[in-house]
Amino acid sequence: MSEHHVNIPAPQFSTYATVIDPPKHVTATHPDELTTASHPQPTHPSAPQDPSPAVPSTPVRVPYPTAPPPIPPAPEAVTAGPKKMALAPSSTKTYKQKRTFKVIIVGNAAVGKTCLSFRFCCGRFPEHTEATIGVDFRERSCVIENELLRVQLWDTAGQERYRQSIVAHYYRNVNAVVFVYDVTCRESFNDLALWIKECEKHGLVGDSEVPRILIGNKCDVECTNRVSTDEAQMFADRNNMALFETSAKLASEADHVESIFLTLLHKLQQSKPMHVQSQDERHQKEQERLILKANETENVEEEGFCC
């Protein structure tokens, strides 16, 4: 018996696959913004499968970056006022009762008496200097040990013809004496003995309660016949005075000039038996000073017409 073989074709199947991406959650910054991606399209069975993740056809809006807060402008720097001098009194602080001290500056003409007082009271060297006629003075207030002190520097003429008519008023109620000489002028140093005798004649002796100091000015000037420091120190020791050498012209010596007068002011502040001028006395001295300067001006004009 013969066998019959029947070939049965294999069954064919059609498979349709649908790939769905998982949902993605995106936070929206505005109500009208999209929060999810659109659904992907089904893939054709004959199309090759892409192993890379599906990219949504519709773009998804992302939140806008938040701008940093604006940086506030830097505060404007406060412009500082003019530099105050050392130990200048403050207007917001209360001090003890103010005292006024009268300090006279004596010495030959052109030794720098006016320049020294200008440097201490005004903090600079005068641009133009002229010979002093009669008497002039400058003031400055300083705070020493919480006490407000006012110092008056009386500058007198070095010429003999002007000095004779003012000595009676010039040496009255004096609290301290400053002798000045020019280190480049030996004559001004030799005449210091005459100035000391004149002070002693009016009661300002070396062993009194009125302090005295000696200042050698113009130490910045080169000179062959210069008064040596040793010679000046010996003279100061014999007359019970402290010696200082400085220059009123040099800006680098400004602190030195400052310390000289502040040292004297410290000594005045610590000394107890001392006459301190009242307001009425200061007003009277101011009137006398104006009268003296007017009289000296008239005398100069009269001398100009002499034959």
UniProtKB/Swiss-Prot annotation:
PROSITE patterns: RAB. GTP binds at residues 107-114, 155-159, 217-220. The keyword Nucleotide-binding applies. A lipid is attached at C306, C307 (S-geranylgeranyl cysteine). Its main location: membrane. GO terms for biological process: Rab protein signal transduction. Gene3D superfamilies: P-loop containing nucleotide triphosphate hydrolases (3.40.50.300). It is a lipid-anchor. It is found in: Cell membrane. The keyword Lipoprotein applies. GO terms for cellular component: endosome; Golgi apparatus; plasma membrane. Residues 42-56, 65-75 have a biased composition (Pro residues). Keywords: Cell membrane, GTP-binding, Lipoprotein, Membrane, Nucleotide-binding, Prenylation. A motif (Effector region) lies at residues 129-137. PANTHER family: PTHR47978. This is Ras-related protein Rab-33. It comes from Caenorhabditis elegans. The lineage of its organism: Eukaryota, Metazoa, Ecdysozoa, Nematoda, Chromadorea. The gene is rab-33.
